[in-house]
UniProtKB/Swiss-Prot annotation:
This is 3-methyl-2-oxobutanoate hydroxymethyltransferase. One of its GO terms (molecular function) is 3-methyl-2-oxobutanoate hydroxymethyltransferase activity. The keyword Zinc does not apply. HAMAP family: PanB. The gene is panB. Belongs to the PanB family. Pathway: Cofactor biosynthesis; (R)-pantothenate biosynthesis; (R)-pantoate from 3-methyl-2-oxobutanoate: step 1/2. GO terms for biological process: pantothenate biosynthetic process. The keyword Hydrolase does not apply. It comes from Paracoccus denitrificans (strain Pd 1222). One of its GO terms (cellular component) is cytoplasm. Homodecamer; pentamer of dimers. The active site is at E188. Catalyzes the reversible reaction in which hydroxymethyl group from 5,10-methylenetetrahydrofolate is transferred onto alpha-ketoisovalerate to form ketopantoate. It is an enzyme of class 2 (transferase).
């Protein structure tokens, strides 16, 4: 039996775009096959985010994430998804030089991972690249507001779009990406009123992460909402579980039983005549 999921009913970028103004789009990150299966059962988009650099690899930011890392985890997620639309982040340095560089790397991501779309950060200055990719068969999700790959120029992980000038700039960025052909735009860490405004102004779904309730959908880093990543906790994260604490308690119990020679017990060992 093949381990590859049957994808006949898999959502695509066109399906996500058609959800504008309708049922909210549910998106979570996924980086591994087991987590992808869980996300696939309940979500519309499985985002292979470059946040994996921080969450899984212990990097201080997303800037050190490579194409090879994104491909490795993209393949793993694709093995676990049969319904959700798989979107893979383009890592820092893989698309900023121009449309041709972006196409080479986006095409590689799609060919090697089996994803349905790529996501890239940036506003009006990326519109030409988005249009170039879309015209050549590569669906693109945009990302404006707080763009983590630009954290060094933004002065940290701060709320963006406060003040009329900044709000107008970010709204124009989102509109430019939508006009260039992006099928959806992520809005990160914006005042709620700005998230609402952009959602009303552009023709494609907005996916909010710290941008308010009025966005067309929401996304969170799955390790954040499950309580598995505790290095920091953004205000916009709601913890739906505390799996990090549960895992810590389970590992502590295992260690105690091993040291006390209580594990393995009789039910966990093999002997003559015992079933395997």
């Amino acid at each position: 039996m093949s381990a590859t999921p049957d994808r006949k009913g898999q959502l695509g970028p066109g399906d996500i775009r058609a959800r504008k103004g309708g049922e909210p789009v549910v998106c979570l990150t996924a980086y591994t096959t087991p987590m992808a299966r869980l996300v696939d059962a309940h979500c519309d988009i499985a985002l292979v985010g470059d946040s994996l650099g921080m969450v899984l690899h212990g990097l201080p930011s997303t800037i050190g994430v490579s194409m090879e890392m994104m491909i490795l985890h993209g393949k793993a997620v694709a093995r676990g998804c049969s319904r959700a639309c798989i979107v893979v982040d383009m890592p820092f340095g893989s698309y900023e030089e121009g449309p041709e560089q972006a196409f080479r790397n986006a095409a590689r991501l799609m060919a090697e991972t089996g994803c349905q779309a790529v996501k890239l950060e940036g506003g009006r200055h990326m519109a030409e690249t988005v249009a170039f990719l879309v015209a050549r068969g590569i669906p693109v999700m945009g990302h404006v507001g707080l763009t983590p790959q630009s954290v060094n120029t933004l002065g940290g992980y701060k709320v963006q779009g406060r003040g009329h000038h900044e709000a107008d700039r970010i709204a124009a960025d989102a509109a430019a990406l939508a006009d260039a052909g992006a099928f959806a735009v992520v809005l990160e860490k914006l005042p709620e009123a700005l998230g609402r405004r952009i959602t009303q102004e552009i023709a494609v779904p907005t996916i909010g992460i710290g941008a308010g309730l009025d966005c067309d959908g929401q996304v969170l880093v799955v390790d954040d909402m499950l309580g598995l990543f505790s290095d920091f906790r953004p205000k916009f994260v709601k913890r739906y579980a505390e799996l990090g604490q549960d895992a810590d308690a389970a590992i502590a119990a295992y260690a105690a039983e091993v040291r006390a020679r209580r594990f393995p017990g009789p039910e966990h060992v093999f002997g003559e005549g015992k079933p395997a």
